[in-house]
């Protein structure tokens, strides 16, 4: 059996809100597998779905830029928030986002593209910035969306400067209608995506592995009721329908008007746009998502320094 450390228990508690002893038991029952331990706690009714903790330990900025019917969102990381607030760093991220619009949006393509202000590649420009600012930084993620006819709306939540912040969203809308009205509903949908973090646009587009994991948890929860298998099957199907409604963009309650689903709000907007609207794509980047900084034990660090 894998050793269950205090750090593992702490991480599981932060992800699930479950008690320390429950977390320790869950890890022991699942041989230290964090994801399996989360499912074990959920199946026992002790914890809700893992929200990926919401912790954004990495510093830096998210930048968005658009040109015509194409837009990009990029994430550039730094070591400290102090550097993220630096004008030179902000100009760099804004510049990288503008360069990214002319590429296919992949990190590799953006890194290899020429940065106009330096005449060098984006990758080499970042290296120069590291030497100048004195702190490590990197282009971590980049996503591009485009449509042949329509708009790609952008949104930065709590912007620190024009096109820069810690959470950026793109939403691609296909339509032959009025572009100004289309961009207005696009921005509202982008704000909704920022708030709700949907997993997919439509229920059938939710990752099959994610859906199967939820189904297995619901089966275990339903079995605990002691009801017959045919009733359990109906219970699971009902819970899966609710799950898809909660994680698929178009079936979610629209945050700006909860009386409507997002699909209904988009349909309503077709009146102002003057043509049908299709939600063709979305991207949501939260700064530091999936990255954890190594936590420093300050007392241990001082003790080590004193010992030389």
From Swiss-Prot:
Matches recorded under Gene3D superfamilies: 1.10.286.20, DNA helicase RuvA subunit, C-terminal domain (1.10.8.10), Elongation factor Ts, dimerisation domain (3.30.479.20)
Domain of life assignment: Bacteria
Main location: cytoplasm
Family annotation (PROSITE patterns): EF_TS_1, EF_TS_2
A Gene Ontology cellular-component term: cytoplasm
GO molecular function: translation elongation factor activity
Region span, Involved in Mg(2+) ion dislocation from EF-Tu: 80-83
Keywords, comma-separated and alphabetical: Cytoplasm, Elongation factor, Protein biosynthesis
Subcellular location: Cytoplasm
InterPro entries the UniProt entry points to: EF-Ts_dimer_sf, Transl_elong_EFTs/EF1B, Transl_elong_EFTs/EF1B_dimer, Transl_elong_Ts_CS, UBA-like_sf
NCBIfam families with a match to the protein in the record: tsf (TIGR00116)
PANTHER family linked to this entry: ELONGATION FACTOR TS, ELONGATION FACTOR TS, MITOCHONDRIAL
The family this protein is said to belong to: Belongs to the EF-Ts family.
Biological function: Associates with the EF-Tu.GDP complex and induces the exchange of GDP to GTP. It remains bound to the aminoacyl-tRNA.EF-Tu.GTP complex up to the GTP hydrolysis stage on the ribosome.
Protein name listed in UniProt: Elongation factor Ts
Organism of provenance: Rhizobium etli (strain CIAT 652)
